[in-house]
Structure formats: structure tokens, C-alpha cells
Amino acid sequence: MIILGYGDKKIENQLDAFQKKYPDKLSVNPTFDETFAHMIEAGTDFFLMPSQFEPCGMNQMYSLRYGTIPIVYKVGGLADTIQEINIDEQSGNGFVFEKYTSREMVRAIKRALKLYKKTEELHTIIVRVMKEDFSWDVSTDQYLDIYHKILI
């Protein structure tokens, strides 16, 4: 597991202790480095982004482009861009927890791990989410649709 970012000092200290105990299983990096973030997003199966406040968020979109499935708290831009995966309906692009509790976050992670065991379905979802388009062309069309509805 790779952890990038900073937050509550008490938690950082606990994570540092875990890293010392399990150096081959955990890497804790209490800073933010854009290049390293992209390396993580490109080289992992899942990307946990448990932000309590995220007005936009780009990392979840980068993760999708790299084929890494995001696990996010439903807030701000994360709520706008990530929808719960539904294998039967072939919809969604990540795993979402709606209450900011450790229990709900663990449930979302468990749903991701359940998908991880379904290799064929996971591959299909990865291919699908890598094609998602968050470009300004799409956003512009969505805004124009809204303005058109307002004016009519």
C-alpha cells in the first residue's frame, strides 16, 4: 500500500509506525508530489481518495485515464465524477462511500476487493473507464444543453 499526502498528525505518526513495522507492505509519504501521484495512479489497481472536502479533484480523473479504479467519499467534484460500479448494468466508474466513517470506507474497499477477484469483469470495467471523456468539449456541450433548456 502506498499512502501519499498529509493530514492529522496523530494518524501520520501511527502510519509511520506501521511503515517501520511492515516496510515491504507499506510506504507512507506525508507530502504531496504531483509526479509521484501520477506514478501511483498509473501503477495501482485502486486509488483511495477519502477527501472530506474536494471542490473539484483531478486525481480521480487521472486514475480513470490510467485504468485505476477510484474509491472516493461522495463529496464535491468526487461526487460529480465518480459513480458506484454496477456490474450488471455495466455502469459506474468507481466505488463510493456516502458517510464519512471508517466503517463505510472499509465497505467501499471491500466492494473493490470483491471486484478484483472477478478478473474478466474488472478488465471490462477498466477498458470502459479509460475511455471516459472529461474534456472541455464534453463540459461545453453539457453547459450549452443547460442554457438551451433555460432559454426555451
Q: Where are the model-predicted features located?
A:
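Short coil/turn segments at secondary-structure boundaries
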Residues: N29-F32, T124-I126, Q142-Y143
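Short, surface-exposed basic-aromatic patches at helix termini and helix-loop junctions that form
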Residues: F18-K21, Y62-R65, H148
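Short glycine/serine/threonine/alanine-rich loop segments
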Residues: D24, T68, F134
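Nucleotide-activated donor-binding/catalytic signature segment of Leloir-type glycosyltransferases, i.e.
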Residues: M1-A37
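Hydrophobic helix-cap positions at the C-terminus of alpha-helices
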Residues: F18, A112-L115, I150
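C-terminal alpha-helical cap of glycosyltransferases
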Residues: W136-I152
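Catalytic binding pocket for nucleotide-activated donors in carbohydrate/polymer assembly enzymes
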Residues: E34, M39-I126, M130-K131
